[in-house]
């Protein structure tokens, strides 16, 4: 096993499932020809044991063993709650 646990920061885009959330992770990628930095988004499913997240929250997630067909991340903490 590696010593470093893989963690990411992202924004919750869906919390309609029970004990699950969908997190959008944004990253900047340099265009290979034009050199401009472009935003790319990856959506991952994460486990939220206590259903504490809401849409728009900024969260920290970490990689874990596969929990289902699409879920292999788990919630570490809610960094910032969404402003209503």
Curated annotation (Swiss-Prot):
GO BP terms in the entry: translation
Alphabetized Pfam families for the sequence: Ribosomal_S17
Function: One of the primary rRNA binding proteins, it binds specifically to the 5'-end of 16S ribosomal RNA.
Similarity comment: family membership: Belongs to the universal ribosomal protein uS17 family.
Annotated Gene Ontology cellular component terms: cytosolic small ribosomal subunit
Protein name: Small ribosomal subunit protein uS17
Subunit architecture: Part of the 30S ribosomal subunit.
Organism, scientific name: Vibrio vulnificus (strain YJ016)
Gene: rpsQ
GO molecular function: rRNA binding; structural constituent of ribosome
SUPFAM superfamilies: Nucleic acid-binding proteins
Alphabetical list of InterPro entries matching this protein: NA-bd_OB-fold, Ribosomal_uS17, Ribosomal_uS17_bact/chlr, Ribosomal_uS17_CS
Keywords associated with the record: Ribonucleoprotein, Ribosomal protein, RNA-binding, rRNA-binding
């Amino acid at each position: 096993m590696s010593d470093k646990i893989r963690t990411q920061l992202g924004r919750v885009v869906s919390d309609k499932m029970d004990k699950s959330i969908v997190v959008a992770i944004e990253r900047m990628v340099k265009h290979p020809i034009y050199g401009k930095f472009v935003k790319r988004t990856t959506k991952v499913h994460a486990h939220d044991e206590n259903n504490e997240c809401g849409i728009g929250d900024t969260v920290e997630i970490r990689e874990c063993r596969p929990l289902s067909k699409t879920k292999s991340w788990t919630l570490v903490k809610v960094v910032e709650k969404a402003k209503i």
